[in-house]
Amino acid sequence: IAYEKIIHQFDEVFTISKFEQNYTKEKFNKGKFIPVFHGNKEFQLLSEKGKFALYHGDLRTSDNRKVVSFLIDVFKEIDYPFVIASSTREDWVKSKIQNFKHIKFIKLKDFDHLKDLFENAHINISWSFQESGTKLKIINALFNSRFSIINKNVIDDKLISNLCIKVSDKSELIKAINKFKNQPFIASDEYVNTLEYYLNNQLNAEKILKQIFS
């Protein structure tokens, strides 16, 4: 990788995933972890119950399409509304869900549209079949919605993953959805503090500035 040839010239390397931090520490003896930056300022306090489970993503990527196929297969076995939201591949999704009245595709317009979906979702599902660090979509769901169910590939930051419901396969995912679909969501003080302090954009930017100018 081209940039690795000049890393030795840098005083420090900032990383936004634990995987990257471990890699740069091991290979270059540099690497300071800073949580991913995002556009959220504060946790949105919503009612305790939403109306559906939500998956959103860019369906131009093969991994996300594989996830959608997997989740459709999951919700064939669950009597609960499921919304797939994306700005792409509408016809492809609709061809897969045409026989399932409780599964719906919504074409995303913009982030405000996504926030409206977050506001009404009771369960957010983030899944990947490949290791990907911490996905921004999870941060957005945690700030703006209710329950988040994940598998291990979408978060490598323990503090953030502790805010989510972690499962590893189809069977565990079905059990989790059935368990939480009727359970009220009540955010603990620890939940809110992790979002508003640990993931605070301004505080994390100040950490970078302090490192640069100290």
Label every model-predicted segment.
Residues L114-K115, E131-G133, N153-N162:
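Short glycine/proline-enriched, acidic/aromatic patches that form the donor-sugar handling elements
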Residues L163-S171, N178-P184:
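Conserved acidic donor-binding segment of nucleotide-sugar-dependent glycosyltransferases
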Residues P35-Q98, K104-K115, E119, D169:
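Conserved catalytic-core segment of nucleotide-activated headgroup transferases in glycan assembly
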Residues I1-V13:
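Membrane-proximal helix-turn-helix segments that form the acceptor-binding/catalytic region
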Residues D11, F118-G133, R146-F147:
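Acidic donor-binding loop of glycosyltransferase active sites
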Residues K5-H8, D110-H122, F143:
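Short acidic alpha-helix that forms the nucleotide-activated donor recognition element
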Residues N140-F143, F147-N151:
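Short hydrophobic beta-strand element within catalytic cores of glycosyltransferases
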Residues Q44, N182-S214:
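A charged, aromatic-enriched C-terminal amphipathic alpha-helix characteristic of glycosyltransferases
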